[in-house]
Amino acid sequence: EDVATDKLFEKCYDGSALGRPILGTEETLAPITTETMHKYMHEYYRPEDTVIAVSGHFTDDDLDYIADLFSVMTGSGRNQITPAIYKPSLVLRSKKIEQNHLCLSFPGVSALSKDRFTMNLLCNILGGGMSSRLFQSIREQNGLCYSIYTFTTPHQDTGLMSIYTGLGEETERRALERILQELHQFCEDGPAKDEISRTREQAKTTLLMGLENTGTRMM
């Protein structure tokens, strides 16, 4: 599953930082030393680029103390970010395992877009849980996969909406055809009113439950 997702980003954002595996590769990690890490930190870590979030019992003095600790950073460099441009592509990776992993991705919206909330609702309607369209159609009604879900990956200037499914070799073609049928039907008919209402309530519940966790509130 992780390999499929890594390959997905590698091809969709080929040539940009978003297309690189987050853990790096053997070739990129081998030359790194303690000295190069310290040099990078001193050059690029700047107070004005640092966000400190806390949750819990902190006094103003505590926050001032934390801010002072980070104020000594003296970096002045600026990374040049190559714009991530979505590129349609097909990538295959062969591996001798019982289960096949399939990812389909489409251009989404950025983390700053006003449409990001609509995108989240769309994602949940299609594959956000056991009552979603894809889960019911592909897994429950037709038994064509082991798991299926949708997810979004919004970034500063771009985003993806993706469908993941784990399935067997004997059902992958039928599952893909059925997924495409569900997408075409959604584009033609749109969501039902009860789907929108249910998904809105799910989003509200998830938000409220998340606020009970101090770590989630901090993030």
What positions do the PLM features span?
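Charge-rich, well-structured scaffold segments of protease-associated domains
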Residues: 1-77, 110, 140-219
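M16/MPP (pitrilysin/insulinase) zinc-metallopeptidase core fold and M16-derived inactive scaffolds
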Residues: 128-144
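His/Glu-based metal-binding/catalytic segments typifying zinc-dependent metallopeptidases
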Residues: 78-133
